[in-house]
């Protein structure tokens, strides 16, 4: 393998998640290796805790999520020192408490986005860091089936497919980069750095993985885990296939996701 198992983000993700989701999380996790995270740190929307536990183990001081069931999984992963069941628009923390807030693939799922952004700014220290990953409007534009339908001039079917995929993904905000920048700036954040990632070829892996990942979904429903046999002998073919993509630079202008590093101005 390119790295030993302890440090290999791709292996750690695909050995415990559906391969398509694990691939995306490994790409995102790799970006965090070059980012300094200052304590106290809040993970906004920690979910099942897998991303935090895998990407920055032991670094998260508080993790919040509205789902108690997800927090039970986060507890089993030891994803944060303290876990709280709460919603993002009403955070149970004092003003200017955190030095860093991270939110990975969460904000797009929140209808009342502006309220949450205002609340994040309240609990973040002056000049504190706010780091997020979100899909942009190229997520639907780059879907392979939609592009094929558009090429065949079946535009209404393409739009239907794009809307269906957004619904499956539970996206309330598949917004353009410009819209994200405007909403973040209006909430009082200074964007220090941003880039797009996950080009069309990588998105196709995610897209088709929703179909081919059905066995993993059944495993989760029946046995409580995505991967029944997380061993290299079992996952070697998919690991080698994904590793060839993972080794490539995933930063791309036409990327379906956007990474933002911000300061509380």
Q: Which functions belong to the PLM regions below?
A:
Residues 1-90, 94, 100-102, 117, ...:
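Conserved N-terminal segment of class I S-adenosyl-L-methionine
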Residues 90, 108, 139:
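Active-site micro-motifs of SAM-dependent methyltransferase domains
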Residues 110-111, 124-126:
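Helix-to-beta-strand junctions that scaffold the AdoMet/dcAdoMet cofactor pocket
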Residues 114-119, 129-260:
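S-adenosyl-L-methionine-dependent methyltransferase catalytic module, highlighting the catalytic core
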Residues 262-265:
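C-terminal beta-strand of the catalytic ATP-binding
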